[in-house]
């Protein structure tokens, strides 16, 4: 892949993740744990890990986290989000690469969501300066399983329909990415 094409893909991934991040702020989720979110932008992160690899996914997470914090005016949450996002991305990429066949897409996503919550909790422990915040861990683990399951299912649905959409765009003159077809066949 050329440098320009890679940069274009990253820009598209960041834009998609930002749209999902901003959209999520408008979705009322009354049953969620305080501080927990669905993590819709992580659908893109998971797809980038599969389609482009861990390093591109880390770039997407860093840019999406910074721009999302900037656009939402919540710069104080940047430290929480970046640590959680980077930890989740690394865990998902490593688990997918080494144990993807064992865990599947949903399992990888659940482990990523749990890692994200643990990363944020570590930052909270440093910021607050007390071990008391770690009492929140069991609640965040349950929330991580639920949100990770949702994100994994959503990413799986995207992967199911992505090859068809790419094939149609190739027929219309757009270049086709064979890696997407390979991943879709692995599912």
Residue ranges, per PLM feature:
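Hydrophobic transmembrane alpha-helices
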Residues: 1-48
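Hydrophobic alpha-helical transmembrane segments
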Residues: 7-12, 43, 47, 55-62, ...
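Alpha-helical transmembrane segments of multipass membrane proteins
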Residues: 17-21, 68, 88, 92, ...
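Interfacial aromatic-anchored transmembrane helix boundaries in multi-pass membrane proteins
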Residues: 21-38, 63-93, 105, 127-132, ...
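Generic transmembrane alpha-helix motif of multi-pass integral membrane proteins
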Residues: 38-54, 91-96
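Membrane-embedded alpha-helical hairpins and interfacial helices in multi-pass inner-membrane proteins
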Residues: 74, 78-79, 98-187
């Amino acid at each position: 892949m050329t440098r320009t094409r890679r940069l274009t893909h990253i820009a598209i991934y960041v834009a998609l993740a930002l749209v999902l991040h901003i959209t999520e702020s408008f979705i009322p989720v009354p049953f969620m744990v305080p501080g927990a979110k669905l993590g819709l932008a992580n659908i893109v992160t998971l797809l980038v890990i599969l389609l482009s690899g861990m390093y591109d996914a880390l770039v997407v997470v860093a840019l999406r986290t910074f721009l999302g914090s900037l656009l939402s005016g919540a710069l104080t949450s940047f430290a929480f989000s970046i640590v959680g996002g980077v930890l989740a991305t690394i865990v998902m990429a490593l688990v997918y690469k080494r144990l993807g066949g064992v865990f599947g897409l949903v399992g990888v996503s659940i482990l990523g969501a749990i890692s994200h919550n643990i990363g944020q909790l570590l930052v909270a422990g440093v910021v607050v300066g007390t071990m008391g915040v770690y009492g929140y861990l069991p609640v965040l683990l349950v929330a991580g399983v639920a949100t990770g399951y949702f994100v994994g299912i959503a990413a799986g649905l995207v992967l199911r329909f992505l090859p068809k959409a790419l094939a149609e765009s190739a027929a219309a003159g757009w270049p086709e990415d064979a890696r997407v077809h390979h991943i879709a066949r692995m599912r």
